[in-house]
Regions:
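Short, solvent-exposed loop/turn elements at domain surfaces
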Residues: 1, 30, 125-130, 238-240
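Extracellular/periplasmic catalytic domains that process cell-envelope and extracellular macromolecules
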Residues: 2, 21-22, 46-48, 108-113, ...
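Structural recognition of the beta-strand scaffold that forms the well-ordered cores
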Residues: 27-31, 52-57, 115-120, 139, ...
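Extracytoplasmic substrate-binding proteins
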Residues: 41-126, 160, 223, 227-273
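Catalytic-loop motifs flanking and including active-site residues across diverse enzymes
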Residues: 133, 137, 242-245
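His/Asp/Glu-enriched short active-site or ligand-binding loop at hydrolase and phosphoryl-transfer sites
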Residues: 134-158
């Protein structure tokens, strides 16, 4: 639909309940259960009589063990809600099969042959980060057989940390993945242009070159060996729950192990089906 025909009902944390009710919905899917200044699911339900307010938990994947994730349970619940149980089950099984296929091969790689990885953000996204195992990217890295060089302190709930340059240099990663975000929560855009609506790789190349031009990183193994990759924000934030990101990572990190893994084919199957 044309964006001009879609009603703006306010922010996800404090929506305009009157506008929502005027649309006569039967169901409202919420992004998070809410806390603090963000209205909870129960509060939204109290303000929307006659509307089923549902939190599916799709932003909580467990890429290494999706069967135990709120993400996969959310897919199955959505199947019941929208009377698409067979389709939801097929999708859930598809994700489980991909995970099993990758894990079966990654688990055979000896510890001393694991590729070391730094999962960071592109230069356009502010201060330098390292995404840890709690984050979707960190989980995708583990499934793909990568050894994430950065971890959060014990009992931390952080998805990333901010390592200093000295620490990064001392870790000297074999591979670096730069997380990029095109569309923001506020509806804005970041460079580089990417995704289905992008046919020109110029901005992607400029962002990559900006990172590679960082003097402090010039002698890192990943930079020297041209093992620095942009990874689209969709592989962290979209409805694949990080699994597709793991597919690409596995093929990049271990092309000789995952010889029959075709990321483009799997990606196309996801889009088509």
């Amino acid at each position: 639909r044309n964006a001009d025909t879609i009603t703006n009902v306010g922010s996800m944390s404090s929506p305009d309940y009157e506008k929502i009710l005027n649309l006569n919905p039967t169901t409202l899917l919420v992004f998070s259960p809410g806390s603090g200044s963000s209205a909870t699911t129960a509060q939204k339900a109290a303000n929307l009589p006659g509307v089923d307010v549902v939190y599916l938990g799709l932003y909580n994947p467990n890429v290494t063990n999706p069967a135990d994730s709120r993400f996969l349970q959310g897919i199955l619940k959505a199947g019941y809600i929208f009377n698409k149980v067979d389709r939801a089950t097929e999708y859930a099984n598809w994700i489980l099969n991909i995970t099993s296929e990758i894990n079966a091969k990654a688990s055979t790689i000896p510890e001393n042959q694991l590729k070391t990885v730094w999962l960071t953000n592109s230069p356009t996204l502010g201060s330098t980060r390292a995404y840890v195992e709690l984050d979707t990217l960190g989980q995708a890295c583990v499934l793909a057989g990568g050894k994430n060089l950065f971890q959060a302190p014990l009992d931390s709930t952080a998805f990333s940390i901010n390592p200093d340059t000295e620490t990064i240099l001392s870790q000297d990663p074999d591979y670096i993945f730069l997380h990029t975000v095109r569309y923001t929560y506020g509806g804005g855009t970041n460079e580089p242009a990417q995704g289905i609506d992008c046919n020109d790789p110029t901005e992607m190349d400029l962002v990559l070159q900006e990172f590679l031009a960082t003097p402090a990183y010039a002698n890192l193994a990943a930079v020297q060996n041209k093992h620095v990759y942009l990874i689209a924000g969709d592989f962290r934030n979209n409805a694949m729950g990080g699994t597709l990101g793991a597919v690409y990572m596995a093929r990049i990190l271990y092309p000789d192990v995952f010889t029959d893994l075709n990321p483009q084919s799997i990606h196309q199957e996801y889009i088509t089906k």
